[in-house]
């Protein structure tokens, strides 16, 4: 007879190992698992470990040619989710040897590959990953990081200000450049290509790059400050993307941009390496993230996509605004903001952080708050995000009744007022509106902005709860 026992496997015999002591080199994953009715938690957890590592549905004779114990993923802990009747957090440990060095693509193909279509599960969500130093050290990470960016731009002690150029599609390159110039001249640090501006018939990329570079140099000459515009280098092929980044580099501008999820991790990592080699900062937009992270029970939480970006490389990444939303969501957002910026982040389940993460001097990423914010939000944003952030006001700049430059002035005055008030010991949360009102007395631009966006409040339920 054959020398192995053929037949369909009972996963939990091999892959459920509650006594396993995790190694410092293991990649650890926390999955939110919703099994099909009648599937026990241990079997579901073991199935996740198996399907995302070495397992297949039946015993194969080639199993005998390798050491499964060395290479298999292990489900080492299961805990029920409070308030849900059939949902579990399943912890899986993966041996480091399963992953190619320096490849986010390969890491995700294994951990969030076929397993998400597995029939025994109703739903599956990857909540968090612990990336061990042994693996993170195989990545270059962000092209420059927070400190180098501040030194390049000569801007310290405050958040940076940005603005997305609108209308996002339809402007000619020259008019687009005019809009950029007005914003930068008024006091913003950056303007931004919208994520869907690539190279369309009404505005080809090379024309846009040229007119935006002209706007940058003109605004720098006028203000004596270093300016930037996130030139979106995202393209249909990696070769074309690098060509666009190279043109930006030739123009001498400080920063380019990439849509990292639609562009893909392989393209993003290539661009990130190019940016470090050529002294370009890299701004990352997360278009498509909600397709992956919005459902509570299925998909991948954004904190994992954020960690993946820090490995793949980017100097800025969009990370939500928090403002006016519920407290729980604030804690969770600040959790992944810390994962982006800090070197060492303690496990803290109240902030959605399932594992202690130690990046070991991998450069940090600036979180970008963007979307629906205006001058009245400035005190809250300054308090929540602190100095190491980029605050982006698209409509909150361009919607100013007097035009782009006064809109930029209003935002800069509001920001400087908030930073000064904070440094003098005022409580931004309590006295925010008063600080803005006081500043608007000597800035007609800010006063006009305050009038347009009277103290608006957002009233939606939090999507992202624990």
Swiss-Prot record:
Gene3D superfamilies: Ribulose bisphosphate carboxylase, large subunit, C-terminal domain, RuBisCO large subunit, N-terminal domain. Its EC number is 4.1.1.39. Substrate binds at residues 114, 164, 168, 286, 318, 370. Mg(2+) binds at residues 192, 194-195. The active site is at 166 (proton acceptor), 285 (proton acceptor). GO terms for molecular function: magnesium ion binding; monooxygenase activity; ribulose-bisphosphate carboxylase activity. It is found in: Plastid, Chloroplast. Binds 1 Mg(2+) ion per subunit. The record marks 325 as: Transition state stabilizer. The disulfide bond which can form in the large chain dimeric partners within the hexadecamer appears to be associated with oxidative stress and protein turnover. One of its GO terms (cellular component) is chloroplast. It catalyses: 2 (2R)-3-phosphoglycerate + 2 H(+) = D-ribulose 1,5-bisphosphate + CO2 + H2O; D-ribulose 1,5-bisphosphate + O2 = 2-phosphoglycolate + (2R)-3-phosphoglycerate + 2 H(+). PROSITE patterns: RUBISCO_LARGE. The modification N6-carboxylysine is found at residue 192. Keywords: Calvin cycle, Carbon dioxide fixation, Chloroplast, Disulfide bond, Lyase, Magnesium, Metal-binding, Methylation, Monooxygenase, Oxidoreductase, Photorespiration, Photosynthesis, Plastid. Its main location: plastid. Its cofactor is Mg(2+). The modification N6,N6,N6-trimethyllysine is found at residue 5. InterPro entries: RuBisCO (IPR033966), RuBisCo_large_chain_AS (IPR020878), RuBisCO_lsu_C (IPR000685), RuBisCO_lsu_C_sf (IPR036376), RuBisCO_lsu_fd_N (IPR017443), RuBisCO_lsu_N_sf (IPR036422), RuBisCO_lsuI (IPR020888). It is an enzyme of class 4 (lyase). RuBisCO catalyzes two reactions: the carboxylation of D-ribulose 1,5-bisphosphate, the primary event in carbon dioxide fixation, as well as the oxidative fragmentation of the pentose substrate in the photorespiration process. Both reactions occur simultaneously and in competition at the same active site. The basic functional RuBisCO is composed of a large chain homodimer in a 'head-to-tail' conformation. In form I RuBisCO this homodimer is arranged in a barrel-like tetramer with the small subunits forming a tetrameric 'cap' on each end of the 'barrel'. Belongs to the RuBisCO large chain family. Type I subfamily. Heterohexadecamer of 8 large chains and 8 small chains; disulfide-linked. The disulfide link is formed within the large subunit homodimers. This is Ribulose bisphosphate carboxylase large chain. It comes from Drosera peltata (Pale sundew).
């Amino acid at each position: 007879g054959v020398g192995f026992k053929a037949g369909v496997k009972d996963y939990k015999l091999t892959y459920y190992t509650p006594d396993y002591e995790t190694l410092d080199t293991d990649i650890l994953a926390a999955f939110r698992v919703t099994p099909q009715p009648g599937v026990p938690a241990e079997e579901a957890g073991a199935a996740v470990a198996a399907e995302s590592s070495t397992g297949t549905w039946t015993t194969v004779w080639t199993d005998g040619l390798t050491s499964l114990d060395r290479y298999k993923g292990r489900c080492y802990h299961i805990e029920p989710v409070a308030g849900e009747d059939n949902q579990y957090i399943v912890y899986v440990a993966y041996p480091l040897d399963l992953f190619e060095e320096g490849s986010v693509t390969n890491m995700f193909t294994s951990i969030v590959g076929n397993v998400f279509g597995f029939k025994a599960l109703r739903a599956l969500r990857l909540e968090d990953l612990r990336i061990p130093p042994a693996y993170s050290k195989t990545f270059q990470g962000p092209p420059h990081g927070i400190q180098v960016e501040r030194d390049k731009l000569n801007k310290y002690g405050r958040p940076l200000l940005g603005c997305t150029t609108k209308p996002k599609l339809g402007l000619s390159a020259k008019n687009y450049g005019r809009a950029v110039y007005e914003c930068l001249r008024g006091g913003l640090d950056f303007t931004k290509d919208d994520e869907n501006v690539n190279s369309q018939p009404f505005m080809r990329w090379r024309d846009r790059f040229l007119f935006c570079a002209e706007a940058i140099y003109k605004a720098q000459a006028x203000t004596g400050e270093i300016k930037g515009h996130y030139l979106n280098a995202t393209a249909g092929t990696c070769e074309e993307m690098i060509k666009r980044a190279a043109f930006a580099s030739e123009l001498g501008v400080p920063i380019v941009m990439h849509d990292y999820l639609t562009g893909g991790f392989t393209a993003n990592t290539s661009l990130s390496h190019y940016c470090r080699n050529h002294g370009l900062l890299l701004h990352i937009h997360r278009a498509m993230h909600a397709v992956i992270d919005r459902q509570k029970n299925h998909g991948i939480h954004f904190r994992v996509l954020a960690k993946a970006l820090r490995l793949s490389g980017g100097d800025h990444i969009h990370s939500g605004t928090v403002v006016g939303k519920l407290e729980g969501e604030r804690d969770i957002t600040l959790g992944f903001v810390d994962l982006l910026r800090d070197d060492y982040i303690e496990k803290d389940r109240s902030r959605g952080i399932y594992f202690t993460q130690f990046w070991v001097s991998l450069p940090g990423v600036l979180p970008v708050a963007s979307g629906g914010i205006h001058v009245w939000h400035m005190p809250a944003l300054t308090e929540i995000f602190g100095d190491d952030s980029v605050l982006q006001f698209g409509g909150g700049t361009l919607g100013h009744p007097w035009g782009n430059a006064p809109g930029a002035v209003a935002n800069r005055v509001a920001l400087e007022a908030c930073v000064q008030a904070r440094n003098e010991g005022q409580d931004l949360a309590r006295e925010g509106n008063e600080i803005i009102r006081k500043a608007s007395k000597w800035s007609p631009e800010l006063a006009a902005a305050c009038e347009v966006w009277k103290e608006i409040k957002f009233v939606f339920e939090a999507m992202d709860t624990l």
